[in-house]
Structures are given as structure tokens and as C-alpha cells.
From Swiss-Prot:
UniProt-listed Pfam families: LrgA (PF03788)
Taxonomy, superkingdom: Bacteria
Swiss-Prot/TrEMBL keywords: Cell membrane, Cytolysis, Membrane, Transmembrane, Transmembrane helix
Family: Belongs to the CidA/LrgA family. CidA subfamily.
Taxon lineage: Bacteria, Bacillati, Bacillota, Bacilli, Bacillales
Listed InterPro entries: Holin-like_CidA, LrgA/CidA
Protein name: Holin-like protein CidA 2
Gene that this sequence comes from: cidA2
Membrane-spanning parts: 5-27, 31-50, 62-84, 88-110
GO biological process: cytolysis; killing of cells of another organism; programmed cell death
Length: 118
């Protein structure tokens, strides 16, 4: 029964992706369909129309496999060795700056959310 629930949870998450892809195709949006599906899921979870516990275990199992999807993109960088050696320091600086900005903005928004709930 546990595996059936896990399969059902992952299946529903996949359906959100398919619906998002369908919406993207029908309305010819430039946003990826999977992102539209994630936004729909986020809205339904944040408005508590769908409870988080319905997806929790399935999402945890999918997160285990997430690093496997990053390996091909990392190995693909080896094809651009000369570009990375010439522009690598600029790219590294941009990544560090964008990470710091993201951390600051996320922290600020988190603080706003915490103080607004009190």
C-alpha cells in the first residue's frame, strides 16, 4: 500500500507538469510548461486547497534522484574548456554575486513573512 501511495503522489506531480505543458501549448506561452505546472501546484499548496501531506513522501523520493539530473549538464561543461578558462573568473564572480543577492532577498522576504505572521 505504501508503494501505491508513493506512485500516486509522484503521478499527481507528473499530472501537474503535463497540465502546465498543455497550458503552455494552448496559449503559446514562452514560459516552460513544467514551470507553469509547478506554479499551479505552489498556488494550490499555499492556499491550502491541497494539503502538503498528499505530496510530501513522493516529493522526498524525487529529491533523492535530483543530483542525477545535474551530472549531464556538469559533464557537458567539459566541451567548453577554452571558454571557461578565458571567461571563468567573470562567470564565477557573477555566480557569487547572484548567490549573495538571492540570499539577501530571500532572507529579507523570510523576515517579512515571519514578522507579518506575529
Amino acid at each position: 500500500m505504501k508503494y501505491v501511495m508513493l506512485l500516486l503522489q509522484v503521478g499527481v506531480l507528473y499530472v501537474f507538469s503535463l497540465v502546465g505543458t498543455w497550458i503552455q501549448g494552448v496559449f503559446h506561452l514562452s514560459m516552460p510548461g513544467s514551470l507553469i505546472g509547478m506554479l499551479m501546484l505552489f498556488l494550490l499548496l499555499s492556499t491550502r486547497i491541497l494539503p502538503l501531506k498528499w505530496f510530501e513522501e513522493g516529493a522526498e523520493k524525487l529529491l533523492v534522484f535530483l543530483p542525477l539530473f545535474l551530472i549531464p549538464s556538469t559533464t557537458g561543461l567539459m566541451e567548453y574548456e577554452s571558454f571557461l578558462f578565458s571567461k571563468g573568473s567573470i562567470i564565477f564572480l557573477l555566480v557569487v554575486i547572484s548567490t549573495v543577492v538571492t540570499l539577501i532577498v530571500s532572507g529579507y522576504i523570510s523576515q517579512l513573512l515571519v514578522t507579518s505572521k506575529k
